[in-house]
């Protein structure tokens, strides 16, 4: 679940309540449930956590600092939630920072704030189908035992 732009920018308290609060609730539920085998948490972050892609660095890089764009409350709430995951003490967690997701429904969005992009900037997007395929493959690799142990406890941009 995520509360995204443009709504997150108009209702920043709600963005924090949904994006941070729901992540906190999931982590609490994991601890309260107490399974025999440690659960795996796949958190979906966002490249928006690292802010604008202004020249001379147009593309996201490994190790880019967390630096949400000014007034991007979606990014702020997701960065706070990701930190919660990292500091949760869970043995198996991963944060996947998604690019913008483009799907057919985006054609109906008329609010320019949705894009948070400057005119001389690049666009880092993937399709909704490619995003779903990556999650499907992650589950399949875990299920068939080919997902390496080193995958967990890290952050990836996808």
Model-based region annotation:
Residues 13, 17-24, 39, 80:
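Conserved internal alpha-helix in NAD(P)-dependent oxidoreductase domains
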Residues 121-157:
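Alpha-helical substrate-binding/gating segment
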